[in-house]
Amino acid sequence: MQFKNVALAASVAALSATASAEGYTPGEPWSTLTPTGSISCGAAEYTTTFGIAVQAITSSKAKRDVISQIGDGQVQATSAATAQATDSQAQATTTATPTSSEKISSSASKTSTNATSSSCATPSLKDSSCKNSGTLELTLKDGVLTDAKGRIGSIVANRQFQFDGPPPQAGAIYAAGWSITEDGYLALGDSDVFYQCLSGNFYNLYDQNVAEQCSAIHLEAVSLVDC
């Protein structure tokens, strides 16, 4: 396993839970809020805790640090691993220098994951990252993504990726249908492409390109270790 020591950051950003004409209505079942498609050989279960790191979709495969999370569930992408803001949004800062990264390899081992087909290789997380109190720590079960506080990973009404509840916030579009690809990327439905959109000195994460300052990324699943 290749070890990468990455910086983690967290910042506070608020997002109101407003109802939407489409999406989740409080009191209704939310586990059926899934995209219509699914990615080939995506593993809908990974019970070992993992983090996610932003990897730019470029020829050099430059990767940021792991994503962090602030106290209310916001996910933040720094130039290192992903953090989580206190209000549940996923965000990333812009200060760290991107580092090159090898593509995550696949493995036949099935100790911690459950692939959708017996003919599919199970994802093996090749990269590791140091974790701290702001690191976004995840588990995946039956296509539902949860953080260390048990909140549900969802795409909310403005297409932003964040954690709430359970249940997810009113108007949420997707709250299930997550998987990890054979290459080790987080996927939602049939897509493993997400978007980071610059907001001040950090990036918010979305499932669609919502503005000119957004760029396409992969979210690489990484092992988390105490350093």
Swiss-Prot record:
Source domain of life: Eukaryota
Induction: Positively regulated by signaling through MPK1 in response to cell wall perturbation.
Keyword terms: Cell wall, Cell wall biogenesis/degradation, Cleavage on pair of basic residues, Glycoprotein, Repeat, Secreted, Signal
Residue positions the entry lists as glycosylated: S68, T78, S105, S106, S107, S109, T111, S112, T113, N114, T116, S117, S118
Molecular-function annotations in GO: structural constituent of cell wall
Positions marked as site (Cleavage): R64, D65
Protein's UniProt keywords contain Mitochondrion: no
Location relative to the cell: Secreted, Cell wall
PIR1/2/ repeats: 65-78
Region (Disordered): 83-127
Effect of S79A: Does not affect cell wall incorporation
Site feature location: Covalent attachment to cell wall glycan: Q74
Signal peptide location: 1-21
Effect of Q76A: Results in complete loss of cell wall incorporation
Residues that make up the propeptide removed upon maturation: 22-64
Keyword Cell wall biogenesis/degradation: yes
Effect of T78A: Does not affect cell wall incorporation
GO BP: fungal-type cell wall organization
Recorded family membership: Belongs to the PIR protein family.
Domain notes: The PIR1/2/3 repeat is required for the covalent linkage to the cell wall.
Extra facts: Present with 12500 molecules/cell in log phase SD medium.
Function as written in the Swiss-Prot or TrEMBL entry: Component of the outer cell wall layer. Required for stability of the cell wall and for optimal growth. Required for resistance against several antifungal and cell wall-perturbing agents.
Protein name per Swiss-Prot or TrEMBL: Cell wall mannoprotein CIS3
Organism: Saccharomyces cerevisiae (strain ATCC 204508 / S288c) (Baker's yeast)
Gene designation: CIS3
